[in-house]
C-alpha cells in the first residue's frame, strides 16, 4: 500500500514538472543535510529518534526522499529502482510510525491507584505522596504537613510544631537553590505553579525568612526544545497559565521585596573557573581533573554570584569574601524534577536531574554518557546532596522512551506530587507506581524501559542501582529495595 502511494506521488511529480521558484533548489540541500544529520546524530541508538530535532530532521529527510529519490524510480534500472523505492518507503513509514507511537489519555487525565505501605526492613526511606495536586499552595502545604506527621520537619527552628523543629530542613537565613528542569518547554519542564507554591511555603518560615531563593538549572546550552539548551523564560510553560515562566515567578516575589531570583547555568557552562578560595571570583564551572574511578564521570559544578550579590559554590557553600570562608550549612538544594520517560535512559527523575548541575560541554559530553554507569550518583555525592527531592507528577510523560521532550499534546495529567530525602527510593517508586501504571492504563505492554526491577545492563533499573552504589560509597543511605520503603499518602486539601 505504501509503495503504491509513493509510486502515485512520483507520477504526479513527473506530470507537474519542476515547481517554480527557488524553494526546490534550496530544499534539495536542506533535505539532504537533514538526512545526513539524522543518520549521524541517531547513529547506533534508534531511541534518539524521539528527540524533537531528530523528528524534524526525519520529516525533512522523508520529504526529500519523496521529491528527489522516488521520481528516479521510473528511469532507473530495476535493481536500483527497487532501492530508491525502499529508501523512500522506509522514510515514510518511519515518519508515520512516529506519529502513531503516542497513545492519548482522556482529557481529564488518569486517576491512578496510589497506596501507602510500611517498610518491612530497617533502615528504610520514607516517601510522601499527595494526590489530587495541581501545583497549588495547598498541595505543597499538604505535603509539608504529611512529612511533619511522620517525623520530617520542613522548617528548621527552635519553635517546635508539627512542621518545624531544631532538626528541620530549611533555616530562616538559608540560601535555597530550587533545581528545576529548564531544557524543555511545554510539559517537559518543571511545573511553574508548583515552584511558585514551594517558594510561598519557604517564605512562610515560622521565624521569618530572611535568606535567599534561586531557581536554577543548566540546560547545557545544547539540545532542548529549540536546540539551544534551557530557558527560565519560555513562552510556553508547564502551568495552568502557560505564559508563567520561572523568571516571571521569581519576579513576582522580588517585586514584593523577597530575595528570589533565577540563574540559568547555561550562561556559564562553557567557562572554566577556580574556586573562590583560590582567588577567583568569576562565575563559571569548577571541573575535576580526573574521572571517577567507579563511574567514569568527570564531576563539575557551578559557582556564581546571585542577583543579590551572594557568592555561591554549589559544592562548598556560601562564600564570604570578607572572612574568606565558606558556610556550607547555609546552602540547601531542593531537587524538583518533572517525571518523564527518557529516550536513552528510560526514566528521568531525581537522579538523572543532576545532569542539570554539571557542565556537559566542558567535559566533552562525559557526564551524559556516564548516566548509564551511575555517574549522576557520583555527582550528587561529590557536589551537594539535596535536602529534599520533590517529584512533579502533575503532568507526566509515560510513553515508553517518549521523553524528555513533552509537548502539551503528549502529556498526561495524573495530579501527583511526591517527596523524599532519598532520591533513589523516590525514583524507584515514582517509576513503578506512577509512570508504569499510567503507561499500562494507556495500553502499553512493553514497560521494560521504565521498570526499576529490570536490571539488564543499560536499563533504568541497572543504572539506578549503580547510582545507589555511588551514593552508598559516599556514606548516604539510599534504598532500591521496596522492603526498605515506607510510603505515606494523603489527598490534597
Question: What function would you assign to each model-found segment?
Answer:
Residues 1-19:
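Short, Lys/Arg-rich, polar N-terminal cytosolic tail immediately upstream
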Residues 16-23, 55-58, 430:
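Membrane-interfacial loop-to-transmembrane-helix junctions in polytopic alpha-helical membrane proteins
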Residues 24-36:
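Alpha-helical transmembrane segments
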Residues 27-30, 66, 84-90:
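Small-residue packing motifs within transmembrane alpha-helices
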Residues 35-72:
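Membrane-embedded alpha-helical segments of integral membrane proteins
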Residues 70-82:
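Transmembrane alpha-helical segments in integral membrane proteins
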Residues 79-103:
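Internal/C-terminal transmembrane anchor helices
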Residues 97-493:
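N-terminal and secondary-structure boundary signal
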